[in-house]
Amino acid sequence: MAFRTFAVGDVHGDLAALERALAKLPPLDAKDTLILMGDYVDRGPHSAGVVELVRRELPRRVPGKLVCLRGNHEDGWLRVASGGWPEFVIPVANGCLATLRSFRDQPVKENELPTREELVTMQHGEFLPDEIVDWMNALPYWYEDEHAIYVHAGLVEKDGRWLHPSETENPTQLLWVRTMRFFEGYRGKRVVCGHTATENLPPELSSFTPEDPLDMWVGEDVIVVDTGSGKGGFLTILELPAMKTYESR
């Protein structure tokens, strides 16, 4: 029997969705692997709670291997903390105010704008505890097992060839890349990724419930598990090799 791997889509601060989806998993054993695809923070109301669960509780609850990948939103906050990146924190759509409010234990309304004080605080990231920044900085860019390659956003193409993550000179590209050529044209070992919400991918190219454009997207050799958690959608966990899904909805 092949070892089981469970890939958790982008959580984006939705602690309730994460708890609901995890509660639907079958009992895990020491041979299983639980992989979180990154983007733990921003947009949803409980980024601090998600980070606490992933950092402290899941290592105790998961009997097998736990892999927490780095997402582009973790990369964004690391850049903010190391010198500032206003282009990341200012756009309302990035949901950075929700993260600040979460770590301050304060609520946030949808599309609410930050105060002047909050905007200054966000631009420096000083509200993030050092231990959280250190944790984000230690998150790996990718993982691979017998079933698939797991990476937050996708693979990088160079000279007409899709590079294995180990060949990518700048690993941050693995967190931010977004090109339809990858989803439509990649052929090779299966890749599981998040980052691009499935509602933005062509449903007719998905072999998994193409009638539901919000559902997990399964192409020829690419599977996308970002089903909109924290931004009006739900959270999906994919079990490999069985291709079973467990959803928060």
Give the location of each predicted region.
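N-terminal active-site segment of His-dependent metallophosphoesterases
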Residues: 1-53, 59
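A general structural motif
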Residues: 2, 29-32, 63-65, 146, ...
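Residue-level marker for buried hydrophobic side chains located in beta-strands
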Residues: 7, 34-36, 68-69, 149, ...
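Divalent metal-coordination and catalytic microenvironments
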Residues: 10, 39, 54, 71-72, ...
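Active-site environment of divalent metal-dependent phosphoester hydrolases
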Residues: 12-16, 42-45, 73-78, 157, ...
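Active-site neighborhood of divalent metal-dependent phosphoester bond hydrolases
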Residues: 43-140, 177
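Acidic, His/Gly-enriched loop-helix segments that form or flank divalent-metal centers
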Residues: 110-224, 228-233
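Short acidic-glycine loop/turn motifs at beta-strand connectors
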Residues: 145-147, 239-244
